[in-house]
């Protein structure tokens, strides 16, 4: 499957509003990579306090968006069924860098690539862009909880 809409996404990861931070998956290569979209709207609950004068998406939520994309890639790579109960947790975040702010109206393109899988620990390279401009990059590690 190369495309997943929000209904499909909810069948494979446990996140729900206000912490479901992926709107669509546009490309999946099992065991390799995934590309997803997050449409950032002014109605996001975090904009109320971050920041009222100039709304900016918190960097930790950009990282979380990448982690959710990685979670979908894991589930699809392992051929887990819809409604599975497995949950993958952060094991680490390395080399996180933020290069541009993400504001209401932006569309985040989230790309994750598998770097390594060892003993159930998955390591990914993640990149979030807006209009082909790098917003965030990081290495993410996850493990089944």
UniProtKB/Swiss-Prot annotation:
Its EC number is 4.2.1.59. It catalyses: a (3R)-hydroxyacyl-[ACP] = a (2E)-enoyl-[ACP] + H2O. Signal peptide: none annotated. It is an enzyme of class 4 (lyase). This is 3-hydroxyacyl-[acyl-carrier-protein] dehydratase FabZ. One of its GO terms (cellular component) is membrane. The keyword Transcription regulation does not apply. CDD domains: FabZ.
